[in-house]
Amino acid sequence: MDGRDWLYCDYVHSVINNKNCLVDMKKAEIKLNVTLDEQNIPESIDWSSTDGETTDQMPAKAMFLALWDAQYKNSLRIDLWTKDMPYDEMKRFFYETLQTLGDTFQRASGGDEMAEKVIGDLRDYCAHFAEKMEVLEEGA
């Protein structure tokens, strides 16, 4: 199966290449807890996962959550950062997020030639962004 084949599962039934099959699917849960101040600005963000190295709550200073709404064919997004997220860390967070979006798209494209070219353009932009925003340390 290449990256363009879609796997849809509801944790009991799967549809693979439009064929129904019964499989025993593993289930994992990701929990997000956001503490807000009086103006609804995040004070803290904590997350945990039942499928990680630890199930303990882990702190985070920022998060970007994107979901695809298949019914309406659009993205649903939640972008949050805490009051104490330093600007330099936010620049690095954006840079790393852009880089990993390219990695994800590359895996999803299944080696599509046009996608590879576009990913190359994204990598070039990431390098430009890092330089202009002084994200990377010298020699890194």
Kindly give the residue locations of the regions a language model identified:
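Short, charged/polar N-terminal "headpieces" of proteins
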Residues: 11-15, 19-57
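Compositionally biased, intrinsically disordered low-complexity regions enriched in proline and serine
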Residues: 9-14, 18-19, 88, 94, ...
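Short amphipathic alpha-helical patches
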Residues: 40, 86-91, 124-129
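Active-site- and interface-proximal helix/loop "cap" or "latch" segments in soluble metabolic
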Residues: 43-109
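C-terminal charged interaction modules
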Residues: 102-140
